Amino acid sequence: MLNQTTAAQKAQTLAEALPYIKRFFDKTIVIKYGGNAMTDPHLKECFASDVVLLKLVGMNPVVVHGGGPQINELLDKLGKKGEFIQGMRVTDEETMDIVEMVLGGQVNKEIVNLINRNGGKAVGLTGQDGNFIHARKLLVQDLQNPSNMIDIGQVGEISGIDPSLIQFLDSGDFIPVIAPIGVGIDGQTYNINADVVAGKLAEVLGAEKLILLTNTPGVLDKTGQLLTGLTPKQIDDLVADGTLSGGMLPKISSALDAARSGVKSVHIIDGRVEHALLLEVLTDAGVGTLITAK
């Protein structure tokens, strides 16, 4: 039985959530799920229950997931070394087969199962399903020689997204869980950065929020201090001085593009915190870094 103090604290937390439930009712929230939240068993359960709760109180969560650690694990088992250029995985034909198997099979199905086990109705998808993520080959600019473009294999950029399948699932009380694999006009599949897919989906769906889960408290400065808010000018400065690099680059770029396209709030938050999703959406204590377009 709860003592009076604990009961009052729980009641206060529930009361605090009410205005946010009203505000975000029937709104779309796109969540990029990655990092430790995908590998720690307890955090996985927390994430799944958070997503189900958001759906039950009337919001439309859409989950886009990565799977880098799982891909690396299988590549290591097969004796194949992974390589990254500017945060993008170099993807030859053999690696693409592995990416599709891990993302579209193992990881996607595990997330769907977790959400369903917690009382939700999740549906797993890749961009091949309904041909809803259209892609083309991505060439990366050589930072040492900007006039040179680097071919990194079957890595794609989004050429278009058809939102009708996601909207149909939302209207049927399903929770879409999306692996970031796109399809070219010739049927070629492409590995697309999950942050990029999440950002573009948020834009196309007219999402109220885009939330990117990471393995850090948010965006940090060179001294390790959390930056609670960032503007485009501040982001440019952080890239120029090397504070932002590697895997954080596509994350920041996608967040900024989404903010500029009209997504009302874009957050990079710490996925290592229990129920980080609920803390961000349903409490006054916003966590992480807020990206704004101005």
Swiss-Prot record:
It is an enzyme of class 2 (transferase). Gene3D superfamilies: Acetylglutamate kinase-like (3.40.1160.10). Signal peptide: none annotated. InterPro entries: AceGlu_kinase-like_sf, AcgluKinase_fam, ArgB, Asp/Glu/Uridylate_kinase, Glu/AcGlu_kinase, NAGK-C. One of its GO terms (cellular component) is cytoplasm. Pathway: Amino-acid biosynthesis; L-arginine biosynthesis; N(2)-acetyl-L-ornithine from L-glutamate: step 2/4. The keyword Transferase applies. SUPFAM superfamilies: Carbamate kinase-like (SSF53633). One of its GO terms (molecular function) is acetylglutamate kinase activity. It is found in: Cytoplasm. Keywords: Amino-acid biosynthesis, Arginine biosynthesis, ATP-binding, Cytoplasm, Kinase, Nucleotide-binding, Transferase. GO terms for biological process: arginine biosynthetic process via ornithine; L-arginine biosynthetic process. Its EC number is 2.7.2.8. The record marks 32, 251 as: Transition state stabilizer. Coiled coil: none annotated. Substrate binds at residues 67-68, 89, 191. It holds the Pfam family AA_kinase. It catalyses: N-acetyl-L-glutamate + ATP = N-acetyl-L-glutamyl 5-phosphate + ADP. Belongs to the acetylglutamate kinase family. ArgB subfamily. Catalyzes the ATP-dependent phosphorylation of N-acetyl-L-glutamate. This is Acetylglutamate kinase. It comes from Methylobacillus flagellatus (strain ATCC 51484 / DSM 6875 / VKM B-1610 / KT).
